[in-house]
Amino acid sequence: MTKSMTKTIAMMTVSGCVALGATAVAAETWDMPMAYSATNFHSAVGAEFASCVTAGTGGDLEIVTHPGGSLFAGGEIKRAIQSGQVNIGERLLSGHQNENALFGFDSIPFLATSFDDSEKLWDAAKGPLTELLAGQNLHLLYAVPWPAQGLYFDREINSVAEMDGIKFRSYNNATARLAELAGMLPVQIEAAEISQAFATGVAESMISSGSTGYDRKVWESLTHFYEVDAWLPRNYVMVNLEAWNGLDESTQNVMEGCSIVAEYAGDWRSIQYTDFTLNELAKNGMTVGPAGESLTAELKAFGEIMTSEWLEASGDAGQAIIDAFNAN
């Protein structure tokens, strides 16, 4: 079944539930923490998903989004959902690779560097990841990729040697390890704190998408963005499994249908947002373009090291994902 067909069926499911007046036992409100700003496309898709569920259940289940880390900081969201502090939320799961190496499958440098390859990798990993999350009291609803990750600096960089000693914003194990290999100093900084970190000199560089740089107006502190297309990490919307199991079938169907639509819309927006945000970085004075051949070769060598390390940490489960990806 094609993605467009799946989306159509999902929309019909949601529409049918609205027409039938899908009902839950009692009206509920679920708060949905999100780490990124309200203007970020992930947050916009999340808000539309929330509205879809609210409408699809006839208001019996209202989901209220809280973007920008306003309810829980990014690093706290997964635990908040697991423990039932909230019933739903969005999180970048690669930030939890220290819990289980599989969470970092989408941040293996230079494995999947395009949207098409990212989709193939997600197809290979979705089953094992869903099972892993279920074991942590989490039910996966949908996942949306970021645009490809590039390198931001406050200066021109032509080789890894020039990165030595630079303070580098990290957001997961992969970014911290990349910094270490390049001789940079990793500093853990959540998305909501990026602008302040660069303005105050806490960080001088990062690897992220054009989307994050645009949302945080990093041109106020940084000067260069290198398109290295290292990986396309994903944000995941998850529900507390006990809360999910407590919903009636009709409400679950609405949420599943809205999730399919959200993932489809998120994929499309991520693709469209890529060129737009890179153009905006350039319009605001940043130097934007591919990294030089020498720097690219050095970074890919780091990628080979990090791939081997990830496979060692993830074991047979990780190898199965890579094998399934390569088979496609």
Task: Name what the model sees in each region.
Residues 1-13:
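Bacterial N-terminal signal peptides that target proteins for export
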Residues 14-18:
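Hydrophobic helical h-region of N-terminal Sec-dependent signal peptides
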Residues 20-27:
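Sec/Tat signal peptide C-region and signal peptidase I cleavage site
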Residues 27-118, 125-129, 133-328:
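N-terminal secretory/targeting leader peptides
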